[in-house]
C-alpha cells in the first residue's frame, strides 16, 4: 500500500475536481476500479470491490486511497475505453492491460 504525501493528495483532488478520473494500478500492472467526483463536486465517487461516495475532502480522499485502494501501488489518470468497457490508464506503460484485438470485449474487429 502506498502512503500518499499531502502534496500528492492535493494534486489528485485538484485533478478530480477538474473532471479527471483516476484508476488504481496493482503491482501486476492491472488497472482496477475508478475514482471520480460527483457533478456537484460535493462527493468523491469510487468503484473497487464495491462502490460508494465520500465527502470531497483531503482526509476522505486519503482514507479512500489508503483503505479501499490499498491493494494498488498507485493511482493514475484514466479514460473510458469502449474496447475494455471500463476505465484504463491514459499512460499506456502498464503491462497488465491488454490493448490487443484478442481482448475478450472485442467482437468482430
Language-model regions, residue ranges each:
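Acidic, low-complexity, intrinsically disordered interaction modules
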Residues: 22, 26-107
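Residue-level detector of alpha-helical secondary structure
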Residues: 9, 13, 17, 62-69
